[in-house]
Amino acid sequence: MTAKTKPAPDIATLTKPKAKVELMRLRLEIEGHDKAYYQDDAPKISDADYDALRRRLEAIEQKFPELVNASSPTQTVGAAPARGFAKVQHAVPMLSLGNAFADDEVAEFALRVQRFLKLDDVPAIVAEPKIDGLSLSLRYENGELVRAATRGDGFTGEDVTANVRTIKDVPNTLKGKHIPATCELRGEVYMLKQDFLALNKRQEEANETVFANPRNSAAGSLRQKDVTVTASRPLKFFAYAWGEMSDYPMEEPTQHKMLQWLDHAGFVVNPEITLCHSVEDALAFYRRIGEKRASLPYDIDGVVYKVDRLDYQERLGFVSRSPRWAIAHKFAAEQATTVLEKIDIQVGRTGAMTPVARLQPVTVGGVVVQNATLHNEDYIKGIGNDGEPIRDGVDIREGDTVVVQRAGDVIPQIVSVVMEKRPAGAEPYHFPHKCPVCGSHAVREEGEAVWRCTGALICPAQAVERLKHFVSRLAFDIDGLGEKQIELFHERGWVQEPADIFTLKARNAELKLEQLEGYGETSVRNLFAAIDARRSIELHRLVFALGIRHVGEGNAKLLARHYGTLDAFLSAMRAAADAQTEEGNTSEAYQDLDNIAGIGDVVAEAVVEFFAEERNIKALDALLAELTEVLPAEQARRDTAVAGKTVVFTGSLSKFTRDEAKAAAERLGAKVAGSVSKKTDYVVAGEDAGSKLTKAKDLGVTVLTEDEWLALIGN
């Protein structure tokens, strides 16, 4: 990521009026980046670019101190808390640190401390890795965790107590003796590099947003409205500081003694932290940790130096937005220059087509980099997610000399192009409109940056996930054929597309499934019987099983009920697909599809794109040849007491399963919802009904027992 700026005027030549204008521009730009970083967890520029903006701001304010005001980023910390979480006032402000970028700046810091304290020598300093995560304050009363808050703007943060209780590294009760009655303990929430990569892989497979780096993933995971999402994320916590303390747990407290106490109290303290007795020791630590940086399991972006004695810290105090007794020694951005030899397209399990830069091998931060993500078509063209130019609008071409940076020490990315070295014959990159794996045509939906392969049924890159979907509970639901079996059969080449499932029995003389570990003649016979039982399938299950983008269970039922029979559905879809053009679709078949209540343009276009791909039609025809019957959709009745009503089922139902209840309600014309709202007409509550029942009562929604529901529907 690079800052998007025009050539800035030389500070030495600035007049006061011009300085005022430049300060206003810098303050607005920095405030925007602070919001993106602290509130949105989506920084738009690199740390190095951000630091450069701040240093320019500080230099101009130093030259024109009369232009400094209270709202300047040099006088504030972070950004105001985001909406959605309760606000928490910090008893002791969580201020940010001043930065040093060179050894002599660290030496100047140490000399300032020595002079301020009027000491003969530089005092002892604690050096610790600067974790690239999210700052957190934990308030304990009588040893019990009562509140957790983010830093926010340094004075007011967000209450994230419920989410923090799911982090294993944060004790709910402090251990040991000498626990202060009140203590605010602070540290950093972070995510290990390997956990970040695994999370992003799961996000991609689930067709969810992937995170740019471990810091963003940690921040986004902590600030979830749904605590179960936070609990599912592998968050870690390092303790390293404190705020309000009713008293200290030892006499003559020091920084390193307090860190030892935090360790005994049940926190994880970074084992790399070192007590240094000179500036030379501190700088040696900086160099040593810098060399280890690439091999550390977590991200760091520098080293923090803190005066060890707490009485010295108290005497030194604070200046504007940072303490006098601490400073952050930042690492330079890890970048290198190399040649982009080729752009390849990778196809994910959901059909997403991602461009990857193949680079001449280059070492960045101690790691050999040969590939870099190019994200999507717009990124290659020099367009950001917000539609604004990135890299000053410069596109990326094969043959370009590029600057590569390891973002967050994990994902290599291209941050700029060396235009002076662009080959004369370099052509703009044209994103492929066909899948490089299966040859199916690709589509890019309006409002999205990603191109997707439409060969859902036949693309090898998508096969495993599509086949798992095909046999899932709401689709064909074949007993004995789950995700593990699909993975095994696909790996052996036995099942590549849905029709192959129904030919397993005919091919078993060659395959010999009964010889597989965990199988025998009886289990294989049962599997074949379960497959044969599904040769007759309801239309809505078949439509859902096809794995068409945006067609979930609900939309599959809408389509099945509208068309009624398989023949009518296929005839309409083929007619709409035949009329599809780049300019759009004005056919009667498409208009009929688009006008189905609850479908709309996005779903209609996805369905037509599926049927416009001949390879999908071929795979579907092969499947239908193996089926004996596709049952017509049962039309919802309109003459019942619940027709047109919205119903929610909650709790443990004893007279029917949840699926049976849902199916019966839909046959009677009711709409079954998953959550309670003002639009809900009935809530049917079984045993141990929880929050949905409570909400229904609060909203005045009619609550029925199972017997009352059965009486209402006349059963």
Swiss-Prot record:
Residues 637-715 form the BRCT domain. GO terms for molecular function: DNA ligase (NAD+) activity; metal ion binding. InterPro entries: BRCT_dom, BRCT_dom_sf, DisA/LigA_HHH, DNA_ligase, DNA_ligase_AS, DNA_ligase_CS, DNAligase_adenylation, DNAligase_N. It comes from the Bacteria. GO terms for cellular component: cytosol. Keywords: DNA damage, DNA repair, DNA replication, Ligase, Magnesium, Manganese, Metal-binding, NAD, Zinc. NAD(+) binds at D47, A48, D49, Y50, D51, S96, L97, E128, R151, E188, K306, K330. Its EC number is 6.5.1.2. The active site is at K130 (n6-amp-lysine intermediate). Its cofactor is Mg(2+); Mn(2+). It catalyses: NAD(+) + (deoxyribonucleotide)n-3'-hydroxyl + 5'-phospho-(deoxyribonucleotide)m = (deoxyribonucleotide)n+m + AMP + beta-nicotinamide D-nucleotide. Gene3D superfamilies: 5' to 3' exonuclease, C-terminal subdomain, 6.20.10.30, BRCT domain, DNA ligase/mRNA capping enzyme, Helix hairpin bin, Nucleic acid-binding proteins. GO terms for biological process: DNA repair; DNA replication. Zn(2+) binds at C435, C438, C453, C459. Belongs to the NAD-dependent DNA ligase family. LigA subfamily. DNA ligase that catalyzes the formation of phosphodiester linkages between 5'-phosphoryl and 3'-hydroxyl groups in double-stranded DNA using NAD as a coenzyme and as the energy source for the reaction. It is essential for DNA replication and repair of damaged DNA. This is DNA ligase.
